[in-house]
């Protein structure tokens, strides 16, 4: 076994403890995540306008905010694209995934925060690797090289705008 695999195995063993907690207590983990997201969003303009408070219940959130379609959210996105901060996410949003334009035949911009890249994509990739390494202890997958391909992107007004794959590749911290 390589040194790299030994180090990764140690890291992944610790990560598997957290993953096992997610499996054993999904309701508790979901409630904790909801509270964190509500606390972060309460101080944005979207949060204030919709009465989002740090101690809001999921039921109250659903009643106050409801389901939002793209057109109702578009003015917030346009302001974030223009560089305004604390609109619908804390701070500045500098990453935007561009959709292929399936519903109205136009591209849509999806705000992507660096925090969401970390929690959803970086840690998600690490968790997938941890589960794989746990299931296949003799794997040599981490001894090789990888090739990652992404879509196109542009920089506008200090923001990175492009295919989700390009946005993720350019912003991910590699494992």
Model segments located where?
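Nucleotide 5′-phosphate-binding alpha/beta core
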Residues: 1-98, 104-173
């Amino acid at each position: 076994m390589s040194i790299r695999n030994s180090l990764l195995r140690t890291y992944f063993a610790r990560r598997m403890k957290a993953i096992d907690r997610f499996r054993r207590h999904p309701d508790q983990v979901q409630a904790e995540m909801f509270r964190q997201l509500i606390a972060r969003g309460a101080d944005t303009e979207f949060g204030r306008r919709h009465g989002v408070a740090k101690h809001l219940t999921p039921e109250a959130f659903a009643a106050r905010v409801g389901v939002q379609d793209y057109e109702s959210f578009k003015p917030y996105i346009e302001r974030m694209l223009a560089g305004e901060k604390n609109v619908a996410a804390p701070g500045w949003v500098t990453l935007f995934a561009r959709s292929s334009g399936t519903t109205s035949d136009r591209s849509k911009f999806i705000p992507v925060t660096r925090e969401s890249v970390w929690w959803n994509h970086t840690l998600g990739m690490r968790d997938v690797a941890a589960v794989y390494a746990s299931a296949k202890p003799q794997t040599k997958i981490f001894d090789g090289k990888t090739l990652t391909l992404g879509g196109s992107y542009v920089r506008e007004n200090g923001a990175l705008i492009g295919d989700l794959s390009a946005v993720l590749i350019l912003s991910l911290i590699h494992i």
